[in-house]
Design a protein with these regions (language model features):
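Glycine-rich phosphate/pyrophosphate-binding loop and the adjoining helix
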Residues: 137, 141-184
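N-terminal beta1-alpha1-beta2 submodule of the flavodoxin-like/Rossmannoid cofactor-binding fold
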Residues: 1-98, 102, 180-184
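Short, glycine-/small-residue-rich phosphate/pyrophosphate-handling segment
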Residues: 109-151
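Residues at the starts of beta-strands that form the adenosine-phosphate
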Residues: 1, 30, 122-124, 155
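Structured loop/turn residues at beta-strand edges in well-structured enzyme cores
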Residues: 73, 91, 119, 151-154
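Short histidine/acidic/glycine/proline-rich micro-motifs that form metal-
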Residues: 8-12, 131-134, 164-166
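Active-site donor-binding loop signature of nucleotide-sugar glycosyltransferases
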Residues: 36, 129, 161-163
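Structural beta-sheet core signal
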Residues: 4, 80, 124-126, 158
């Protein structure tokens, strides 16, 4: 099963178009999409952190607050579609990762303090578009670090199109080239 984490706010989003092409090429017939803009995601606060920590310490992961983590863990492949805005991804993606990340469920630490992820996925695709230059250090690299170091996903792949809104550039042509260059 492919999990598509859709963090595209705009209708006809260029990032969404590119991400859906990646999903089509992967070819798995089962796709679960979570559109972050249609969910009531909230950043972790004092109460939610305390609740999560208490339940995790008791080994009780039946609360709905763990549903996003369970869905993420059970996926065979993950595709994240997130535009590059204001030198990063939309803050809603960070909020989603906060809601997914739970020590004891999605990641466990060994006696030396080394995290070991429990995710089933072997690969995560990070798909993005940018109106100007795309800077992976401020978006993809953070996601890559979290999922490889703490979630146990061994491979990530960046697919992006940049400079789509630069005067004199042809955004349709840029997107076509990015689509043609997709390798899985």
């Amino acid at each position: 099963m492919i999990l598509y984490v859709n963090c595209c706010a705009r209708e006809n989003s260029r990032t969404d178009i590119l991400a859906r092409e990646v999903i089509r090429r992967i070819g798995d017939s089962e796709v679960e999409e979570i559109n972050l803009y249609e969910k009531n995601l909230k950043p972790m606060d004092r109460q939610s952190v305390a609740k999560r920590d208490s339940l995790a310490a008791a080994g009780n992961f039946s609360d709905p607050m763990f549903d996003y983590a369970k869905q993420f863990m059970a996926s065979d492949t993950i595709v994240i579609g997130a535009p590059f805005w204001d030198y990063s991804f939309p803050s809603l993606l960070k909020t989603y990762i906060e809601n997914v990340f739970c020590v004891g469920l999605i990641s466990v630490y060994d006696e030396n303090g080394v995290p070991h992820g429990t995710c089933k996925a072997k690969k995560l695709y990070y798909v993005s578009t940018a109106g100007g230059p795309f800077i992976p250090d401020y978006s993809y690299e953070w996601i890559r670090a979290v999922v490889t170091r703490s979630f146990g996903i061994p491979e990530t792949k960046l697919i992006y199109a940049e400079n789509l809104d630069i005067v004199g550039h042809n955004p349709d042509e840029i997107l076509e080239k990015a689509t043609a260059s997709i390798t899985l």
